[in-house]
Amino acid sequence: MKIAFLLAGLLAAALAALALWRLADRRTDARTWAALAALPQPTGTFDPAMVADLPDPARRYFLYTIAPGTALRTTAVIEMGGEIGMGSKDAPAYRPMRARQILATPAGFVWELDAGLIGGSDGMTAANSWTRFRLGGLLPVVRVGSNADHFRSAFGRVVAEGTFWTPAAFLPGPGIAWEAVDADTARVTVAAMAS
């Protein structure tokens, strides 16, 4: 009987520890979200003259993605819904999912996923990056980050997604360098923000 009480106590302590760990992760996500949302936004509106000196492919990109007179924004909040594959290519095991993301190019992002039994977040700031997912809301099944390779990957995601959601972040300015590759290709180099 004592062993049963001991095991029950250990199980309760483990569940409490996992719940506290999840709470700490959610607080980190919320603080990061709030910090990204509070970043200053550029002022003014898009004027084609802003890109007149860029290589022709870059200029065409901006003229296609930002209408003249559009307010310049480098942060976007994106709501997603649909299905996510949790299986293999042959048997994708699609599950309903909902997600939300804040993307503040180039400062970082937080992506929060709820796919029923699986949930968690990806994120990046100037100081850190992470991927954290849990089974049943408690049991960690993926927990990586806080290393240079993960950070580079997360920063690449910020830049890639930013080209669709926050093109104003790539207008000429500090940390942005455009160069022509050929008549139909331009390359942008984006400097990561210092912590």
What are these regions (language model features)?
Residues F133-A194:
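Flexible, processing/modification-adjacent segments and terminal tails
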